[in-house]
Amino acid sequence: KVLDRLLPDPGEGPSAEKREKGFFRMRNRAKTSSGRGFNCRVEADGDPGYKATAVMLGESGLCLALDGSGLPDAAGVLTPATAMGESLTERLRAAGHTYEVSEV
């Protein structure tokens, strides 16, 4: 019942202007067990819950439909990034998303 009060009703949500003005920026730092360090940056313009997610879903579908020969044949249950790898990353970059990894 708490979520019903917090979440928008079906058909409600941010205006087109708010969806366009939205964005997300993530920065992560990781260290391997051997001590190597990495920085990761992921960014996209557009509301993350509406516009950016729609781009990710659309590009994932196109990747599955059009890039299938470069994807694993069988591997069990995978995340989109594991299943589609660099093919999906390149599609998302072409759609305006940023994905960068650098060693520290």
Can you say where each PLM-predicted feature lies in the sequence?
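C-terminal catalytic/substrate-binding lobe primarily of soluble NAD(P)-dependent oxidoreductases
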Residues: K1-V104
